[in-house]
Amino acid sequence: MINKSLGTFILGSLIILDAFVWGLIFLQPKTISPEIHFLDVGQGDSTLLLLPSKVKILTDAGPDGKVISSLEKSMPFYSPYIDLGIISHPQRDHYNGFNYLLNHYRFGAFLVNGRDAPAPGAEWASLLETIEKRGIPIIVIGEGARLRYDDTVMSIVSPIKE
């Protein structure tokens, strides 16, 4: 039989935890315009776009796992989901960080330009295999493609169609 003070402690703890969770949900800052975060990944590129509707788009992920610590500074810890990963071109310093991110984050889809990696290696093959195994759609896009979400429109200007 649980004594009265232990029951009171458990109930009080649950109420505090509930208030904390709802505080995280309702007190987070409201984004009224898109935010762009240029992530420090060392050699390479990575850019996070946060849309007002909470959509997260990550373009490139650098050459290694450094992207994880940069991303953790720009995204809420309780949101391990990225709506769209974009690989601008298949060079290691742009795509390989996704190999690390896929162990920590879930992705809704990936956009690629459809061109082959200049020297495809095990890392590129591993990335494509992991994406496929997880059932994440890979969408091939090129010049002239337009992505629309709510009031946000992104136009693809490269690579030029062959």
Regions found by a protein language model. Give the residues of each.
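Non-globular, low-confidence helical/coil segments that flank catalytic cores
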Residues: 2-162
